[in-house]
Structure formats: structure tokens, C-alpha cells
Amino acid sequence: MSTKITLDPVTRIEGHLKVSLDVEGSTVTRAYSSGTSFRGFEPMLSGRDARDAAQIVMRMCGACHVAHGRTGLEALESIAGATIPNQARLLRNIIQAANFIESHLLHFYAMGLPDFVSELPTVGSMTVTDSLLAVGREGSLDESVLRDHAAQAISIRRACYELIALLGGKIPHPSGLILGGTTVFVTKDLFDSVQKLCETITGFTSSIPEGDVELLATAYPTYESLGETGCGHLAHGCFPDRAGNPMMKKGFLAADSATVASWDDVEITESTASSKLAGPSPLAPFSGVTEPDLSKSSAYTFAKAPRLAGKPFEVGALSRALVNGSTPAHRGVWARYRARAAEARLLSAAIATWLTELEIDVMSAPEEAVTLGSGQGFARGEAPRGALGHWVVLEEGRDRALSNHLTDDVERFSSR
């Protein structure tokens, strides 16, 4: 006998998600993930001055706002042929890295850990949370260590927020990211404050998150293979050096290959066959349509279905790790958490290095205003949760009907 289970809304995410499962016995026979909200950022931008875009697209997400802002700016800068000052590149890298670290700590300690421990500590206004413990615990687990670290992680996340606010103007949605550079003027006092925050963050991320993941992996060994998708892994690359080469490389690792390959953007398409969206399907991003159509009988979600060469793909910290040479025995739950924890450590060290390259009392804004005319451009980027892209067409400095955004969540919650 088949049973239908519906979770609506799914909590501990940033968005509107419903999951429906058809279950026979103990086996899930069919599953649907539904984006239940029409976001409409593309039509919202149509006809607007393109310089508004970066601040607007940051509102797509409260967790990966920096990545959307930066990628949106880079798409516009590609149209203008603008090269940002080195000081601005360093500051964008530092701001985005701090956003990655905060998001990884949020994901593990606030969104994931409650499933694996009996309760979390009371910290300030945060109340004790009872947990429905995940199935599969086979080993002993010292929960007190994890509870202590979860409390410390809140302070470290705050340090990340403070760092972003100091260099980006505010948090979330930093206003200091502008076309052609950033607005911050790094004084000696500002530098000293940021460096102190970096030391605080590094003191935690250098070993604690990775150790905590291993504690859980020992207690819940079956989660090593749980969640393996069999899909390929895509990474867009991020944190460029002065020559434009990304610290985290870009590439695609097919499911049946051990070799990282390049790909052509023409291979990326988005289908709306199962989406409550109008237009022919599938379409390349530069031809994309984002208009609601509630009359489609087969539609069950507002999410599109992105494909690379016609196949679904996975994105995120694990994908970045695989593309950059990691070879885990399994690609399940713990591989994903290990990848996030390792990134938190690596990016903390990277921030310390970028700080040594910053110049004191040097402008990070462009010497001359960047002028936007007509043309089309795109940029690919990485958010903490995975790869994203912005494709833009301008007419006389304004967004034309097309301003298409491929987000990491759309890739993760792809429709059929």
C-alpha cells in the first residue's frame, strides 16, 4: 500500500520548499521537491538602470547575498570591459570568504547538528532545542563537546558578520560592493580591527569544525554513503588572484569520470516542462523566460530544471572539493560536511594572506565611473551552497527583458 508524506514547509532552509514522497513499505518510490514561491527577480529588473541590479539581486538570498552581488557586478563589468582595482579584488575576496565561513558554520552547527544531538545550549535569547535524533547512531558520542562548539560557533559567526560589515558597509546585503570596485577606504585602524577578527575566526576554524564532523561520522557511519546522487559535479571557480585565476578552480567532473573537464556555456539549458513558468523549453540562459503560468496541469513547482549537456548535476562545497582534486571514498552526508569544514579552514587562512596584500589608505573604487551602454554579458560565481550564474542583456544601460539568474538552490531543487 502506497503512502504519501508531505513536508510543507521544509524548515532550516532559506526559502519556500515543499517535499512530497510516495512510500511503499520502507521504500520511497517517487519524490517531488517544489519551490512554492514565484520570486520574479528577472521581471523585477526589466527596464531598470543596471547599476541597481547588484543591490537587488543580493535579496535573492540572505545566506549567499555576497555571491549574487559580486556575480551580478562581474556580469555588468564584462559588458563594460571594466577591470577593477587590485584593492577591490582583495576586498571582494575577503568579504566573500567571510560569507562562506559564516554560512558553513550556520549550515553545520545550526541546521545540521540538531538532528544528531539531544539538545543544544541556551545562548542569550536562543532557547534549548529538543531534537528528533537521526536514525543510525551506532557509536558513542560525547554530545557535550558538540554543544560547547555550537555555542562558540555563534560568536565566530558574529565575527564573520562584523568583518563583512566593516569592509562591506552592512550585513546582510553589503552596500559597499559597487560597479567597478568597492567603496571601502582601508585605514590602519580598520585594518587592525579586521585582522583581529580574522585571528578570532581562524582560532576556531583551524581544526574544530573538521574534528566535530569526524565525531559525528564515527557515531553515524551509515551516513558516509547516504545521499550519494550519482550525478556529475560542477564548480564555477572563485576567489581570483591578480591574474584572474581562481583559487578554487572551475571544472566539471562527470559521474563516470575521474578527469575534470571544461565545459561550454552553450551546454547549459533550463527546462520549464514541470515548472509553473511560461515559454518554450529547454532554453539557454541568454534566451531564458521567467514568467508565471499557473495553467499548466503538469507543473508542480516554480523552480526550473537546469541541465549540463542534458544531464542534472550537483553543486556545492563537495563539488568544489572534487573538482579541485579531493578523492573521498564516498560522496554522501559526511563528505559534504567535511568539504564545508575544510573550506572554512582554508578560507580563514586565505583571508589572512589577502590582508597582507591590502594597502593602507588606498582607494578601492574605480578612478573613473564605469559607463554601461548596450550589450550582453555574463559571469559565473560560487555561493557557499554552490555554483551560480548571471546572464544580462542591456539596452542603453538598462536591463532589457532578459536578466537571467541561475542559482545554487535551483540546481539543488531542480524540477523534472
Cite the ranges covered by each PLM segment.
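Catalytic-core signal marking the mid-to-C-terminal active-site face
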Residues: 400
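His/acidic/aromatic-lined binding-pocket segments of jelly-roll/cupin-type domains
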Residues: 392
